[in-house]
């Protein structure tokens, strides 16, 4: 791919994301104003969060959030609370499924000031087989998560994960906003970034692919530099590895853990931190 082709590619990505968001909210607003469809967002919410019964034999999570704040916190046992009236909760074969029936929007398609909230408490030290989160809009805060496999599809909002451990594979896609991972270990990471800032501090085990979009990316790789092989393509932005800039297509190191980085539009800063 030539330099001009890379420029066109990443500018097209940025434009497509902005255009898609504008179209979605434009359609929602137009339908609401013309036909008067949709409830007031506050009618979809309770005055206070209520507790929802869940079993203690949960092995996987499947969460779909339309427009709400999602929190996953540590505690002594599994518990779930929410102020969303039409929240759907189902358990089957150890899989806890949580989804929203309606979006929290007004008749003109703008989110209300009163946000929906979902709080899932997970016992400290529990390990899931698979965790799937599909969040279209809203902030996500996860204190700690351990799983064999994770599949995250984040839309618009801020995502903060304090600690994460993935032992098999992880597939993470972001839209517009910020992604911050504070600590952990991730095996075979496939990270596809959209528009916004990303800060990732973790050990990356196996083979990882990071496709950067538009914005600044900070990778703080836990372990020694000798543990990694970095294969980088700077795109039309800049890549810094421990303060040294990499241009074009380059390979650094010969460690067992391979990280393939495709630069986008913006800066990528890679550093190493010993445990």
Model-predicted regions and their roles:
Residues 106-108:
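Membrane-embedded segments
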Residues 6-9, 13, 35, 129, ...:
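Polar/charged alpha-helical tracts
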Residues 111, 161-164, 168-275:
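Short, surface-exposed interaction patches in beta-rich subdomains
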Residues 29-101, 111-134, 139-151, 160, ...:
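Short linear S-[DN]-x-LW-Φ motif typified by the pepsin-like aspartic protease active-site region
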Residues 1-41:
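Gram-positive cell-envelope targeting signals
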Residues 6, 88, 101-103, 136, ...:
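Arginine residue identity/basic-tract feature
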């Amino acid at each position: 791919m030539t330099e001009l082709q890379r420029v066109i590619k990443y500018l097209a990505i940025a434009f497509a994301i902005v255009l898609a968001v504008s179209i979605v909210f434009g359609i929602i607003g137009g339908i609401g104003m013309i036909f008067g469809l949709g409830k007031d967002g506050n009618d979809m919410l309770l005055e206070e969060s209520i507790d929802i019964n869940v079993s203690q034999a949960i092995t996987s999570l499947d969460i779909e959030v339309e427009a709400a704040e999602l929190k996953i916190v540590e505690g002594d046992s599994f518990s779930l609370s929410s102020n969303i009236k039409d929240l759907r909760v189902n358990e089957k074969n150890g899989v806890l499924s949580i989804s929203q029936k309606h979006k929290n929007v007004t008749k003109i398609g703008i989110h209300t000031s009163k946000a929906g909230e979902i709080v899932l408490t997970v016992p400290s030290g529990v390990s899931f087989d698979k965790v799937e989160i599909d969040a279209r809009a809203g902030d996500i805060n996860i204190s700690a998560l351990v799983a064999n496999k994770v599949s995250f599809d984040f839309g618009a909002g801020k995502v903060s994960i304090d600690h994460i451990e993935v032992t098999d594979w992880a597939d993470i896609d972001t839209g517009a906003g910020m992604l911050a991972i504070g600590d952990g270990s991730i095996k075979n990471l496939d990270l596809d970034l959209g528009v916004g800032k990303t800060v990732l501090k973790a050990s990356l085990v196996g083979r990882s692919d990071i496709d950067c979009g538009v914005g600044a990316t900070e990778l703080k790789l836990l372990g020694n530099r000798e543990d990694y092989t970095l294969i980088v393509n700077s795109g039309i932005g800049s890549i810094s590895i421990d303060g040294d800039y990499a241009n074009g297509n380059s390979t650094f190191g010969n460690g067992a853990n391979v990280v393939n980085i495709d630069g986008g539009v913006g800066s990528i800063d890679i550093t190493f931190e010993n445990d």
